[in-house]
């Protein structure tokens, strides 16, 4: 029951079916900061974040299987296609966010989370295209984010300018 309630909240408050994708978050703010009343209002962050949507895709695909709800699978795959089509560059991989357009390409978290969502979509559908896309992102991680001393950088050189670095 709790899973159904969480899905209901996400779909009612954070899902935009016209895209289709999930908004960033809902913030709760006190109506009057000078008093300690319980009155508050909410603001929806309508920016679409790749990593958060990828996590939602994985969760909805799991929920579809566990709850026997094909509609959740369809919704997850729709979000996956939107994020892949609108938040990706062939050279730089996944962009971190999308509002008026895609912004902040090449962050490790976005490549990794979207890669996991694509692998999960492959398991849910058997469609090889999802596995091929995950491999594309893995190549970007290795080529653009690998540290020659070991491990990976969380962002590439070209992405640092977005964050104000030289």
Predicted regions and their residues:
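Glycan-recognition and catalytic cores of secretory/periplasmic carbohydrate-active enzymes
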Residues: 1-166
């Amino acid at each position: 029951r709790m899973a159904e309630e969480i899905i209901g909240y996400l779909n009612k408050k954070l899902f935009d079916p016209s895209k289709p994708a999930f908004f960033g978050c809902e913030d709760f703010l006190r109506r009057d900061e000078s008093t300690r009343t319980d009155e508050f209002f909410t603001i929806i962050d309508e920016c679409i974040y790749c990593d958060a949507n990828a996590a939602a895709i994985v969760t909805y695909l799991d929920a579809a299987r566990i709850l026997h709800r094909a509609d959740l699978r369809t919704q997850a795959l729709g979000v996956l296609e939107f994020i892949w089509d609108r938040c990706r560059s062939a050279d730089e991989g996944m962009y971190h966010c999308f509002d008026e357009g895609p912004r902040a390409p090449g962050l490790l978290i976005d490549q990794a989370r979207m890669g996991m969502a694509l692998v999960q979509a492959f398991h849910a559908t058997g469609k090889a295209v999802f596995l091929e896309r995950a491999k594309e992102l893995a190549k970007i991680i290795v080529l653009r984010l690998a540290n020659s001393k070991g491990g990976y950088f969380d962002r590439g050189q070209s992405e640092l300018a977005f964050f104000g670095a030289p």
